[in-house]
C-alpha cells in the first residue's frame, strides 16, 4: 500500500521503534513522508530506520527530557527540513489497582505518558509554528476515557493526555497557529505492550490463548486490534485529509467505548 497522502511531510514519532509508532512510521513512509524515529530502543529503532531507507532517521529519545526532544527536532530538521508532524506515541503501562500500585510506579507512568506528551507538544508547537503549521497526534487510550481498575496509573495518565490535547489544540487555534492537535484512542492493540501482559499471564499459570481471549473479549468485535489499523487512524489525523479537525478524539477500539 503506497500513495502520496503524506507527501512533503516530515514527522517525528516518539516511541517509533515498535508498536503503533513503528506501524505509523511504515504507513507514513509508504505515503511519501520522511520520518524521525525517536526511541530509547536503539537496536529496534536503527533496524527499522534501515528497513525504511533514506526516508527514515533514528534518534535516541527519552521523552522525559526536554533537551532530548529539542535535539531530536534539530537532527530531523537538519536531515529532512522543517518539521510538519509530531506523533506522541511513546508510552508505558504498569498494571495495578489503587491498593497495589506504589507512588514510584505511578510517577514513572505519568512521567513517560503525560510528561513526555507534554514536552512533545511544547517542543512541537515551537517547531511547527515557525513553519507552515502542521499536525500533532497524541496517543490516548480507551482506558483514559472509561477507566480501568487494574490500570490505575495508565488510566490516569491517558485521561490527562486527552485533556492536554484539547488544551493545546485550543491554544494553537486561538493563537492563530495553523497547527491541529488531536488524540487517537486505541483499545487493546496487539503490540509488544500486550505481549508483555501475555508473558505475565503465562508466568502466573494461564495459557497464551486464555490471556489473549481475555483482552479480546472486552471488545464487542471480540478480537485484538492490529497495529496497522491504529496506524491508519494516526495517518488520517496527521494528513491534510483531517484539515478541519482539531481537539478531537478518534477511537480505534472494536466498539469498546460504544
Language model features by range: what are they?
Residues 5-36:
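Canonical Rossmann dinucleotide-binding motif of NAD(H)/NADP(H)-dependent dehydrogenases/reductases
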Residues 141:
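Residue(s) in the substrate-gating loop at a strand-loop-helix junction
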Residues 121, 157, 165:
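Active-site helix of classical SDR
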Residues 173-180, 245-247:
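Short, small/polar-rich loop/turn modules that mediate ligand/substrate recognition or access, typified
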Residues 97-98, 102-110, 215:
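Substrate-binding pocket helix/loop in short-chain dehydrogenase/reductase
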Residues 126, 170-174, 243:
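Alpha-helical segment proximal to the catalytic Tyr-Lys
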Residues 80, 118, 223-252, 257:
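C-terminal substrate-recognition "lid" of short-chain dehydrogenase/reductases
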Amino acid at each position: 500500500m503506497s500513495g502520496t497522502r503524506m507527501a512533503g511531510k516530515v514527522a517525528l514519532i516518539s516511541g517509533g521503534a515498535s508498536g503503533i509508532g513503528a506501524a505509523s512510521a511504515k504507513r507514513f513512509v509508504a505515503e511519501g513522508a520522511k520520518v524521525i524515529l525517536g526511541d530509547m530502543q536503539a537496536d529496534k529503532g536503527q533496524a527499522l530506520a534501515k528497513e525504511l531507507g533514506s526516508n527514515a532517521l533514528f534518534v535516541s529519545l527519552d521523552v522525559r527530557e526536554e533537551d532530548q526532544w529539542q535535539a531530536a527536532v534539530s537532527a530531523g530538521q537538519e536531515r529532512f527540513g522543517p518539521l510538519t508532524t509530531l506523533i506522541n506515541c511513546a508510552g508505558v503501562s504498569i498494571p495495578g489497582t489503587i491498593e497495589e500500585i506504589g507512588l514510584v510506579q505511578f510517577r514513572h507512568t505519568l512521567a513517560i505518558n503525560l510528561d513526555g506528551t507534554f514536552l512533545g507538544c511544547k517542543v512541537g508547537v515551537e517547531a511547527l509554528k515557525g513553519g507552515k503549521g502542521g499536525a500533532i497526534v497524541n496517543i490516548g487510550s480507551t482506558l483514559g476515557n472509561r477507566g480501568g481498575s487494574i490500570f490505575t496509573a495508565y488510566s490516569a495518565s491517558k485521561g490527562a493526555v486527552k485533556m492536554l490535547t484539547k488544551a493545546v489544540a485550543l491554544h494553537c487555534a486561538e493563537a492563530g497557529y495553523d497547527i491541529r492537535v488531536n488524540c487517537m484512542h486505541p483499545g487493546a492493540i496487539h503490540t509488544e505492550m500486550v505481549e508483555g501482559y501475555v508473558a505475565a499471564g503465562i508466568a502466573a499459570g494461564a495459557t497464551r490463548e486464555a490471556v489473549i481471549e481475555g483482552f479480546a473479549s472486552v471488545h464487542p468485535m471480540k478480537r485484538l486490534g492490529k497495529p496497522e489499523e491504529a496506524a491508519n487512524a494516526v495517518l488520517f489525523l496527521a494528513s491534510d485529509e483531517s484539515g478541519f479537525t482539531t481537539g478531537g478524539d478518534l477511537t480505534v477500539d472494536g466498539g469498546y467505548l460504544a
